[in-house]
Swiss-Prot record:
Strongly inhibited by MCPA-CoA, a metabolite of hypoglycin which is present in unripened fruit of the ackee tree. It comes from the Eukaryota. GO terms for molecular function: fatty-acyl-CoA binding; flavin adenine dinucleotide binding; glutaryl-CoA dehydrogenase activity. It comes from Homo sapiens. GO terms for cellular component: mitochondrial matrix; mitochondrion. FAD binds at residues 177-186, 212-214, 319, 330, 387-391, 416-418, 434. This is Glutaryl-CoA dehydrogenase, mitochondrial. One of its GO terms (biological process) is fatty acid beta-oxidation using acyl-CoA dehydrogenase. Substrate binds at residues 138-139, 186, 287-294, 415. Pfam families: Acyl-CoA_dh_1, Acyl-CoA_dh_M, Acyl-CoA_dh_N. Its EC number is 1.3.8.6. The gene is GCDH. It is an enzyme of class 1 (oxidoreductase). Its cofactor is FAD.
Length: 438
């Protein structure tokens, strides 16, 4: 089985395997001892675990737990130590993608082509662990997996799949996704990028500009969407080094600073006909990609939220004011309870959506509902946690302000909070409200 295969792959290649085994053994001993003491002291009524309020753990498969725990070890041991300076210096370390490729977590739901073929829930758990460290790192993985590998797998020819997917899965190639333009954000149908067909040499000439593109300054492969002369919107595979193609970096971001963000500028880029994705000829192509990415985001932001909750809780327990811990304050306890409630509901909704995805029963509106809800709630939680830390809350050494600033961007990209409200509103009423004239 592919799922079992990736578990073995993660365990055999993943750093910190000894730590993971030690942690699992220690946890088992602690749990066993705790149950013995509890049985002696109390009746057998169910106990509440605030770290897993509705027992998510029991609803995951053994492979999903194994994949999550191993990737958590990698994230905490290899990524967490470097994020502080990476964020301060606005640096994305390219080798992270190679490391993820070694772990087998790029394009993980794709079957074959060197990919793991795991469940949608496993993919969500990976996104959650990665964004627990930083949204920028999760963005890089999401783009590679959902916005680059997915369209090649779903809309590409067999030749394109064989050529690109194995290298993308290994992290040997880094990809980006070009849809947003300077004058075309929430309305991609108004894109100005054009593709002119040259019948003489069976190629397309692309002209236009894409902006706010994750990974573009370091990308080897560019999935670009352009309007053709027949009015259809098609996907094109551009390779680094093509004449007329450039990808300048966007500087001065206050969000996602550990992620490389830039533009894609195409000035007469000639693309061979075999680099056109044959299975997409409308906005349904890029929207299908975005739907996959939004699903991962819905999981990921909860990882950031959990970090903020745990940090705020520990700070409230340690910080003494007026002779007592901050956690003694009723307002603090209410805030923690609100955070825990929203995270728990979000996680279990994501679990249900993941199971539906694997049964091909997940409508795009379901994804919009959770992307909108979880991103909005995650941003609220991060802001609240920052406030609970007082003046220390604005120090990046506590990491909460970094999560809060990152989530401002995550709440906006892949469909803004309000755009997803309109998607849901259309489903509820049967009336589209994106424009006034239609």
């Amino acid at each position: 089985m592919a799922l079992r295969g990736v578990s073995v792959r993660l365990l055999s290649r993943g750093p910190g395997l000894h730590v993971l085994r030690t942690w699992v053994s220690s946890a088992a001993q602690t749990e066993k001892g705790g149950r013995t003491q509890s049985q002696l002291a109390k009746s057998s009524r169910p106990e509440f675990d605030w770290q897993d309020p509705l027992v998510l753990e029991e609803q995951l498969t053994t492979d999903e737990i194994l994949i999550r725990d191993t990737f958590r070890t990698y994230c905490q041991e290899r990524l967490m130590p470097r994020i502080l300076l990476a964020n301060r210096n606005e640096v994305f370390h390219r080798e992270i993608i190679s490391e993820m490729g070694e772990l087998g977590v790029l394009g993980p739901t794709i079957k074959g082509y060197g990919c793991a073929g795991v469940s949608s829930v496993a993919y969500g758990l990976l996104a959650r662990e990665l964004e627990r460290v930083d949204s920028g790192y999760r963005s890089a993985m999401s783009v590679q997996s959902s916005l680059v590998m997915h369209p090649i797998y779903a809309y590409g020819s067999e030749e394109q799949r064989q050529k690109y997917l194995p290298q993308l899965a290994k992290g040997e190639l880094l990809g980006c996704f070009g849809l947003t333009e300077p004058n075309s954000g929430s309305d991609p149908s108004s894109m100005e990028t054009r593709a002119h067909y040259n019948s003489s040499n069976k190629s397309y000439t692309l002209n236009g500009t894409k902006t706010w593109i994750t990974n573009s300054p370091m990308a080897d492969l560019f999935v670009v969407w352009a309007r053709c002369e027949d009015g259809c919107i098609r996907g094109f595979l551009l390779e680094k080094g093509m004449r007329g193609l450039s990808a300048p970096r966007i500087q001065g971001k206050f969000s996602l600073r550990a992620s490389a963000t830039g533009m894609i500028i195409m000035d007469g880029v000639e693309v061979p006909e075999e680099n056109v994705l044959p299975g997409a000829s409308s906005l349904g192509g890029p929207f299908g990609c975005l739907n996959n990415a939004r699903y991962g985001i819905a999981w990921g932001v909860l990882g950031a939220s959990e970090f903020c909750l745990h940090t705020a809780r520990q700070y409230a327990l340690d910080r003494m004011q007026f002779g007592v811990p901050l956690a003694r304050n009723q307002l603090i306890q209410k805030k923690l309870a609100d955070m825990l409630t929203e995270i728990t509901l979000g996680l279990h909704a994501c679990l249900q959506l993941g199971r539906l995805k694997d049964q091909d029963k997940a409508a795009p509106e379901m994804v919009s509902l959770l992307k909108r809800n979880n991103c909005g709630k995650a941003l609220d939680i991060a802001r609240q946690a920052r406030d609970m830390l007082g003046g220390n809350g604005i120090s990046d050494e506590y990491h909460v302000i970094r999560h809060a600033m990152n989530l401002e961007a995550v709440n906006t990209y892949e469909g803004t909070h309000d755009i997803h409200a309109l998607i849901l509103g259309r489903a509820i009423t049967g009336i589209q409200a994106f424009t006034a004239s239609k």
